[in-house]
C-alpha cells in the first residue's frame, strides 16, 4: 500500500503539471481511473514478476471493482497493462476491450503517466518528495526533488530516462531529467 501511495502521489503531480502536454483529460475522469490503477498495477506480481503487468491486467479485468463501470474497469486494467514494456497493439485483447477512441486515449495517456511515476519510485523507501515539470519547445524536463538533499538519485534518473523512447513516440517530446 505504501508504494502505491507514493506512486499515486507522484502520478498526480505529473498529471496536474502536464495537462494539454501528456494528456487532455477535461473532466478528470482519467485522474480517478489513474488513481485506481496506481493501487492495482502491481497486483500481478503475486502471480509472476516478469510479466506482472499482463497478470495485473487479467486480475483487474476479471475482478469486481465496486463503483466502476465495465468500460472504466477495462480502462483501469489497460492503464496497468501498458504502464511498462510495450505500447498497445491492435491485436492485444487488452486494447480491443477499449471500445471508444476516448477510452483508448485515456488509457494510453494515463498509462504513460503511471509509467513515469512508477519509474521514479523504484526503491522500497521513498526518496522523491516531488517533481517539477517544465515544457520548452519540444522538450519536457523533469526535476526530481529529493526528501534528503544528500541522497543520490541516479537510479530514479536512469529509470525515468528509460521512458525517453515512449515519450518521443507518443508525444513527440524530448525527455530531459535533472
Enumerate the language-model features and the residues they cover.
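Glycine-centered secondary-structure boundary/capping sites
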Residues: 1, 22-23, 168, 172
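Divalent metal-dependent catalytic cores for phosphoryl transfer on phosphate-bearing substrates
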Residues: 3, 9-133
